[in-house]
Amino acid sequence: MNQKYSLQNPKSSWRLIPLLRVSGQLQMAIDQWLLEQHQTGKHPPVLRFYTWASPTISLGYHQRRWPTSWQQLTWQETPVELVRRPTGGRAVLHQGDLTYMVVTSGLTGKRLDAYQAICEFLIQGWRSLGVELHYGSAGREYAHNPSCFGTATGADLLSADGYKLIGSAQLQRGNTILQHGSIRLSRDTTLFTQVFGEPAPPPVELPIKQEGDALFQTVIQALTEAACCCFGIELVTQPLSDAEWQEILAQPSLERRYSNN
């Protein structure tokens, strides 16, 4: 990792929030709240992982065009939730994936440098699991593709055979950064085709012979260990408290802020 953009600080402690499974609207509210708390100096840097309570399509903050049919989609008789991320990028179908989130500060340089400084722990963590990743290089066609996983930019991570495993998006507020991304572990290919009108990308071949929660925990363990090593930090596990939940749920216009409207 380029030292200019290094996150390493031997005396730094980050908060690790245990795996959380709630609605997409609440996940976006939590990410936004953590960003604002860190920006105002009330909260340390944080790493967390989460899954989605039901299949969800998350739109990029500036994404204004998407099929109207997305608002009536169902999967196994469950409505597909449609939410808006605080970060940019294209639409992501969250179903069978694991999402990571980092909130930190102190990175300088161009946005891509910040992406790659944070993504280093993803590269190292997956390497420890036997998967080599490299960055994508999509051109202008990215802006015309409604699906985040339809192309790969310099902020995305691909497997050795060229298939996108992790799609990331970022929001910078002054010196503070929120970066989160979808790690494609398993997915219903029929639902992907229903959403985007095209075949699902081929699955990334993983050497890990696990599924479901066991797979999630194996990946989380590898990535948390890599984060400690790459960033030179100590991770302190701390779930969200009742008081913090109250603050998150009390955010003004929570439903309007993170809905697709």
For each of these PLM feature ranges, what is it?
Residues 49-51, 65-110:
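A glycine-rich, hydrophobic loop/mini-helix early in the fold
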Residues 7-73, 84-85, 148, 158, ...:
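Active-site loop/lid in soluble adenylation, ligation, and acyl-transfer enzymes
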Residues 151-158, 162-170:
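Aromatic/basic-lined ligand-recognition segments
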Residues 61, 102-106, 159, 185:
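Short beta-strand-to-loop capping motifs
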Residues 109, 120-141, 172-261:
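Long, positively charged amphipathic alpha-helical accessory segments at protein N-termini or as interdomain linkers
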Residues 54, 64, 171-172, 190:
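Short, glycine-/Ser/Thr-/acidic-enriched flexible segments
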Residues 53, 159-162, 173-174, 187:
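Short acidic-glycine loop/turn motifs at beta-strand connectors
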Residues 95-154:
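Internal, conserved structured core segments that host functional sites
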